Amino acid sequence: MTTNRWVIHNGKFAVSEGTNWNVVQGFMVVENDKIVHIGETLPEGDESLTKVDGKGLFFLPGLINTHGHAAMSLLRGHGDDLALQVWLQEKMWPMEAKMTSEDVYWGTSLSVLEMLKGGTTAFLDMYDHMDQVAKVVEQSGVRAALARGVIGLCSEEEQLRKLEESAAFARQWNGQADGKITTVISPHAPYTCPPDYIEKLVQVAHDLNLPLHTHMSETLREVEQNVADYGLRPVAHLEKLGFFSRPSLVAHAVHLNDEEIEILAKHDVAVSHNPGSNLKLASGVARVPDLLKAGVTVSLGTDGPASNNNLDMFEEMRLAALIHKGVSGDPTAVPAGEALLLGTSYGAKSIFLNDTGALQVGMKADFIALNIEQAHFYPHTDLISHTVYSASAKDVEHVWVDGKQVVKHGECLTMDEERILRESQLAFDSLLAR
């Protein structure tokens, strides 16, 4: 294999050390898909490497979106200002029932285009027609953990079909796209999957040695219904069903008590905090400071584009840093540096990736560059703070995944933006007319 070794010079790099951040001015050397050097000086012998000028740019680990439904970009704006169950039952599920694999392909393409251009280099997706999602991931060069989301409110025959689809997809695609695709087993939620069905999906995860992902405790109504149906709150319910016997990520986790936080910490369960979606659907505000204090890994997700309604991870970091200050009355809650960890390295851990999420030697070369020669970044007092409190997806200038540039000067190099915009509009129009 030919070695591709090159260097970014004259750049500013966000380097995390534990829970702290340093801004290093100097050089970063990339060899093939890995970061091999980062520091104030260039290693001896590397003077003749191909150089990328980092002047005016701030380099960060790629952002990681740990919960979403990419194809739902086709339903953006279709059902706003509604409570979760009304939104799902009256607006989303009837439309989703009509979606074809082609719809999923174009909806996912639209979302991946938005994510890449906005600095997201890895994401977790739970949906149907996941072979189409995987094709988009493979074509675009993004990194993804993918799950065929399974709803069990159906006949036993259909439950079995969905379970087999989930397992087949997971086997077929795990490790594909040069390792950029990993797979997950994903019952949709305790309120949409009977207990015995969740147990069967947990067994599939054991059989395939894969992690698990689900929605959990998103609304107070969901928690109360779980107690009424099963005599347990969702966390204890999932623990009883063996869900946490596999590496696990739960989305939302808004309504938790102290005992539930202890259970999540005991089993090393990660939480995907979705502040934008939770606010928009009036689901509530998760106890993120308490989760972090208990040692739970917390990351950030946008949820689907129909409940956010964008995929701007800078916005999620800023919301995470702001709302917990307002709710707790503590101005030190989720400081900027911690919010950036939620969007990067904690995200990698949450979606079971151990070689991305940080600018460090030996890590995958998944990183982004922000244009900081703009009014809202000045003065350059604290670039970590500016990233969380001032930046947006529109500030992303360049993006690399696996050492390959996928966005250059704000333009995606791996996707046909004009066609995606056209086809996604046609797909929605067709969906609405069915």
Regions found by a protein language model. Give the residues of each.
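His/Asp/Glu-enriched, well-ordered alpha-helical/loop segment
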Residues: K240-P247, P289-Q374, V388-A391
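Helical hairpin unit composed of two closely spaced alpha helices linked by a short loop
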Residues: K280-A282
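Alpha-helical scaffold segments that flank or form the walls of functional sites
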Residues: R76-V142, E165-Q176, S424-A433
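Active-site microenvironment of metallo-dependent hydrolases
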Residues: M1-G26, E31-V36, L341-R434
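Active-site gating loops and adjacent loop-to-helix segments of metal-dependent hydrolytic enzymes
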Residues: L74-W106, L113, S140-S155, L160, ...
